[in-house]
Curated annotation (Swiss-Prot):
The pyruvate dehydrogenase complex catalyzes the overall conversion of pyruvate to acetyl-CoA and CO(2). It contains multiple copies of three enzymatic components: pyruvate dehydrogenase (E1), dihydrolipoamide acetyltransferase (E2) and lipoamide dehydrogenase (E3). Keywords: Oxidoreductase, Pyruvate, Thiamine pyrophosphate. NCBIfam families: PRK09212.1, PRK11892.1. This is Pyruvate dehydrogenase E1 component subunit beta. It comes from the Bacteria. It is an enzyme of class 1 (oxidoreductase). It catalyses: N(6)-[(R)-lipoyl]-L-lysyl-[protein] + pyruvate + H(+) = N(6)-[(R)-S(8)-acetyldihydrolipoyl]-L-lysyl-[protein] + CO2. The gene is pdhB. GO terms for molecular function: pyruvate dehydrogenase (acetyl-transferring) activity. Heterodimer of an alpha and a beta chain. GO terms for biological process: pyruvate decarboxylation to acetyl-CoA.
């Protein structure tokens, strides 16, 4: 059976809304319009306007309302049309949702999911293309999820909705329409559990979200050059499955990290720091990070491609750590 990422997310929300009457969806155009990307299609008809709530165009307003509802014991799912717009709600996310459980001595929980597309799509320019994975991962009190496959989107969304802590659920606009094989029943997937998509012996490639597709393509290309790659899909950025990364590096002795976001203070830099501390003696080459260029993402299609990680960038990085003649 195949389903799209869009359908996987919808199924997860529907199942949890049926299971727990405290779960509700709130955001711009999630009800009457059925979601900017049709992720919430059909939920209004099934659950009504008290549990699928359209809002004015004010992320600061509806995010704050949802955080308050979570403090009161409900389980909101907040849809941002894009995480670029979530900057308007940053205060509520960082200073209220992420901090209150700690500051209340554990007396006040905040079971809330903030979800929506993150990163580049296709020619939506600099203000709609930013990648916030590293930004949210930097904040104590937030859990950060960035899946690739439909099964992982559903399984991790089930876990996110049931979690008593705020979860940043980072999707990708381009992936919404992608279809994947899925089992008949998808169970909740625990956080902090990476997936090894391919085992290998020469080099470890670590990535997440839509960059998994790029890495899968490159792994097949490099196989023709007798470079055997191990590919790890992180799925959860925070908490991070450090053990899977370290064990893989101990086996392959080389590491390349791929992320769409910027290099400086990025996810890749954090992983590299951990590996240097925990597995330095196992490394046969310096760690390579393939990332987006340190520029606002251009609108022009030719420049947009140059600013994003490419297959050639990854191939070059892998061959470099393998001391392969390029």
């Amino acid at each position: 059976m195949q389903i799209t990422v869009r359908e996987a997310l919808r199924d997860a929300m529907q199942e949890e809304m049926l299971r727990d009457e405290k779960v509700f969806v709130i955001g711009e155009e999630v009800a009457e319009y059925q979601g900017a990307y049709k992720v919430t299609q059909g939920l209004l008809e099934q659950f009504g306007s008290k549990r699928v709530i359209d809002t004015p165009i004010t992320e600061y307003g509806f995010a704050g309302l949802a955080v308050g509802a979570a403090f009161a014991g409900l389980r909101p799912i907040v849809e941002f049309m894009t995480f670029n717009f979530a900057m308007q709600a940053f205060d509520h996310i960082v200073n209220s949702a992420a901090k209150t459980h700690y500051m209340s001595g554990g007396q006040v929980k905040c079971p809330i999911v903030f979800r929506g597309p993150n990163g580049a799509a296709s020619r939506v320019a600099a203000q709609h293309s930013q990648n916030y994975t590293a930004c949210y991962s930097h904040i104590p009190g937030l859990k950060v999820v960035a899946p690739y496959s439909a099964e992982d989107h559903k399984g991790l969304m089930l876990t996110a909705i049931r979690d008593d802590n705020p979860v940043i659920f980072l999707e990708n606009e381009i992936l919404y329409g992608h279809s994947f094989d899925v089992p008949d029943i998808i169970e909740p997937i625990p956080f902090s559990k990476a997936k090894i998509l391919k085992e290998g012996s020469n080099v470890t490639i670590v990535t997440f979200s839509i960059q998994v597709k790029l890495a899968l393509d490159v792994v097949n290309i490099l196989q023709n050059d007798n470079i055997d790659c191990e590919l790890i899909d992180l799925r959860t950025i925070k908490p991070l499955d450090t053990d899977s990364i370290i064990e893989s590096v101990k086996k392959t002795n080389r590491l390349v990290i791929v992320e769409e976001g910027w290099f400086f203070a990025g996810v890749g830099a954090s992983i590299a720091s951990i590996v240097m501390k925990e597995a330095f003696d196992y490394l046969d080459a310096p760690i390579e990070i393939v990332s987006g260029k340190d520029v606002p993402l251009p609108y022009a299609v030719n420049l947009e491609k140059l600013a994003m990680p490419s297959a050639n960038d990854l191939i070059e990085a892998v061959k470099k750590v393998c001391y392969y003649s390029i």
